Each structure stands twice: as structure tokens, then as C-alpha cells.
């Protein structure tokens, strides 16, 4: 039976706090998830270069196919990325380009498509021109 993966969010730019989270949860075999805040922080990129276990990189990449593919190429040295996110709104060509480049980083990488941000609701979607309700997107 395949076990479900459980992730622990390391949503901080404080390197000491990230290390504390990882140390307190390592016996549970959780996979750390690093988002934009940590990745762009002073120590984020350097920490991930040296991190020896698999991790989830939650960057929610969103741009034209060539740009997201090039952005992934620039993090090719982060070999322990097991999961990475891309906004599904990049379109089919963007998703294909992203996955193709992601597999060059790690042959077993899992690309997760983000369809909608959890912070959005029907009203906020209407404000940015979406006509459908959240459940339909």
C-alpha cells in the first residue's frame, strides 16, 4: 500500500526557525515545503543547495513557457527537489515546457499544477474578471 505524503510548511525567512521545524519533525518523516518567502530569503537558496533530503519547492511559477523553463534551468543544481509547483494558468504549452525542464533536474520530480490560490473566493475572482465560481475553476 502506498503511503500518503505529508508536508510541513517552512513558511518563514528565518533560517533558525526553518532548522527548528525540520529538527522537530524529522522523526515523522515529513517532507519540508519551502515557498517564495524562504526561497527568496537571504539564506534560502544556499540552504536548499546543501539540504540532503527531498523537499517540496512551492514557487507557483507563472509566466510564458520559455521563461518558466529558463527559470527552472537556473535552479538545476537543487537536485533534491521532489515536488515543485506551477500555476496551471500558464496553459498546456507552459505546463509541458515546465515538466520537461523539471525532469532534467530530477527524473522522479512531481510537478503540481496550482489551479487557484486558497486565498481567492468568488468575489475576488469576479474582481479579476473570472465569471465562474471557485468550485468550477
Name each model feature, range by range.
Residues 2-3, 63, 67-137:
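Conserved anion-binding
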Amino acid at each position: 500500500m502506498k503511503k500518503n505524503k505529508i508536508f510541513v510548511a517552512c513558511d518563514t525567512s528565518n533560517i533558525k526557525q526553518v532548522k527548528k521545524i525540520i529538527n522537530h519533525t524529522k522523526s515523522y518523516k515529513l517532507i519540508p515545503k519551502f515557498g517564495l518567502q524562504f526561497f527568496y530569503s537571504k539564506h534560502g537558496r544556499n540552504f536548499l543547495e546543501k539540504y540532503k533530503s527531498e523537499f517540496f519547492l512551492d514557487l507557483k511559477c507563472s509566466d510564458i513557457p520559455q521563461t518558466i523553463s529558463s527559470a527552472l534551468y537556473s535552479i538545476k543544481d537543487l537536485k533534491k527537489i521532489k515536488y515543485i509547483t506551477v500555476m496551471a494558468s500558464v496553459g498546456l504549452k507552459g505546463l509541458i515546457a515546465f515538466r520537461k525542464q523539471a525532469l532534467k533536474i530530477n527524473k522522479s520530480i512531481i510537478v503540481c499544477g496550482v489551479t487557484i490560490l486558497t486565498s481567492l473566493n468568488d468575489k475576488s475572482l469576479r474582481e479579476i474578471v473570472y465569471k465562474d465560481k471557485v468550485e468550477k475553476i
